[in-house]
Amino acid sequence: MGIADSMKKAAFSTAFSYIGKNPEENAPKLMAWVDKFAGDGPNSFPTQRAAVRKVINDKDNNMHHLVMDIMKDTDPEVLKATFMNFFLNANIIGWPKQEENRKKYGCNIPWAILLDPTSACNLHCTGCWAAEYGNRLNLTFDEIDSIITQGKELGVYMYIYTGGEPLVRKKDLIAICNKHSD
């Protein structure tokens, strides 16, 4: 991580600590700070920021209540990791790297990678596509690690696990999340 990214991380960590003290009062102030920080360029997510701002400012909005409940009821460390990984890594740091690599390689770089660690499942849901492929298809820990490492080099920090039932591989997934905590 370069100096600029380290400074962004420190700023976001401070901002998160600030909002956590009183989410209802501090969320609009934080959003104003994010607007200044993001700027007005094409990669500044203006549509997404407007949607977040609308939810934060409209106290009668159901999403506002949901967000505030999540902020108040979720373990602070879990909330901080989610905030840092989603907003900072996957968007503020990741998006410019993705844009750079799109131009460099002349192809799309996804914002998120959908990863199926296993086709195994213990749920037997009606109509599930995974059942059609059997339950013996598995990515190794090293293969999952390689996919995530390569993705991060391209600016991808968001991974969505599907399957099968991903938690059949619970130990591996926890280990991979610990290894790639960003």
Locations of the language-model features?
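Auxiliary Fe-S-binding modules of radical SAM enzymes
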Residues: M1-L66
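Conserved alpha-helical substructure of the radical SAM core
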Residues: A38-K179
